[in-house]
Amino acid sequence: MFAFAGGFSYLCVNVTGMKIYLLGPAHPFRGGIATIMETMAREFVRRGNDVRILTFTVQYPEMLFPGKSQYVTTPPPADISIERAVSTVNPFNWQRVGLRLRRERPDMVLMKYWTPFMAPCFGSIARLARGNGVTKVLCQIDNVEPHEHHIVDRPFNRWYLGAVDGFVYMSEQVHGELKGYTSAPMLFSPHPMFENFGSRVDRAEACRRIGVDPSFSYTLFFGLIRDYKGLDMLLRAWSRWRPSGRRLIVAGEFYASREKYLDIISREGLAADVVLRDRFIPDDEVRYYFSAADALVLPYRTATQSGVPQIAYNFSLPMIVTDVGGLSEIVRDGRAGVVCPPTVEGIEDALRRMYERGMMDVVRKNIAAERERFSWGAMCDRIEEVYAMTKV
């Protein structure tokens, strides 16, 4: 059945009883992408499907991984099936997994794609799996062109993206890039809201848990620290603004030069104004950071989309984001936050708009309604629609 609204058509489907394999990060691998895979698996199970996640035996070789650990130490989830089966660096493994999928004939193989590093592995598996005349390979895609470019990106992307039957993308920038590689069916669905971090806690308790002085107010920068995320611009904007009674919490593990940012903090005289928690923040601590702060800042230089705003939505936390990639599609100005140019001056002005010109009160009134746009059910609906649009 087709429904028409505002010039767009949507294929309404209700697909149950399918055999679905998800391929991507999941327990014991850490991070937001693993959370996405596990949450999508739960939603497809809830809909009456037979679901299994095939995650990695090797995700990244240790010498290529910039963080301290790729793994969590918590027990595996008991409500979904996760099997460690895929090595991204072993072509013989790709053949084994691809032939296994061809033999087991799942209705759908749903892959999570966020970096061309995965392309040789994923593309090889996809091409073998599709050879049974039954299995459709779909992709829920974060990025096409990576934030840090390499000469192999385009050929790797061509190898993988050309092996996929259909896509669900999360920003118009990715949509435009994707069309340069494939004419396969593709639909938009925004990044769903993360709901696995619990609910907001009392601010004083949150401050106690993360070891900060509750007599100060806090603004939060959260997530892995890479150069494209613009923390240096935020620090310089903070130095220009110099608010009284407010500190900036920087919470996340450095995937870039730590010394570069410490040097900025020192040169700008921000040692007393910045609370640095430079480590990976485990899931059970996330809510304390988002409960201690009254706003989140994403000062990115470039982006396609980001999962961090979806954590903020879970806690109804107002946001300041730069107008790059798909961020302004997710965080609408005056609704969930303030959107600004990706410059030091633009970020400083956005901080002043939020805290000195009344925008905080406006956003707090509107953000609850904005949350309704970001459900996991909607994401899985789009995946099922793309499945129905594809041909074996």
Map each language-model feature to its residues.
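Acidic donor-binding loop of glycosyltransferase active sites
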Residues: Y288-T304, L317
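Nucleotide-activated donor-binding/catalytic signature segment of Leloir-type glycosyltransferases, i.e.
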Residues: E259-D284
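N-terminal strand-loop element at the rim of the active site
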Residues: A26-R30, R42-R103, V174, K179, ...
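Conserved acidic donor-binding segment of nucleotide-sugar-dependent glycosyltransferases
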Residues: D333-E345, L351-M359
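Glycosyltransferase donor-sugar binding loop
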Residues: F56-Y60, F222, R247-L262, R279
